[in-house]
From Swiss-Prot:
Pfam families noted in UniProt: C1-set
Biological process, per Gene Ontology: adaptive immune response; B cell receptor signaling pathway; immune response; immunoglobulin mediated immune response
Disulfide bonds: 28-87
Gene3D superfamilies for this protein: Immunoglobulins (2.60.40.10)
PROSITE patterns in alphabetical order: IG_LIKE, IG_MHC
SMART domains for this protein: IGc1
Oligomeric and partner information: Immunoglobulins are composed of two identical heavy chains and two identical light chains; disulfide-linked.
Gene source species: Homo sapiens (Human)
The protein's name: Immunoglobulin lambda constant 1
One GO MF term: antigen binding
InterPro entries: Ig-like_dom, Ig-like_dom_sf, Ig-like_fold, Ig/MHC_CS, Ig_C1-set, MHC/Immunoglobulin
UniProt-annotated location(s): Secreted; Cell membrane
Amino acid sequence: GQPKANPTVTLFPPSSEELQANKATLVCLISDFYPGAVTVAWKADGSPVKAGVETTKPSKQSNNKYAASSYLSLTPEQWKSHRSYSCQVTHEGSTVEKTVAPTECS
């Protein structure tokens, strides 16, 4: 079988264009993992976030590893009212966490 591969996790904050349109979506990209099962948890300042989360099913990449994405939909007020947001990805018992912090300037 294929060797186990830990995921690469990238977390993107909302774009300034999106915030100007009164929306805020955080995107957590999870790529190059095997086997194709991951658990994604979102946190605001360390507290679990359940609402507004949408995670895609892992899909197989051309290199036979898997990729998935998770989206967290917020209002700009929610985004600005927290110090940090984290995307926590658990794969085969190991956890990768990426954090973004809202900047004051826009």
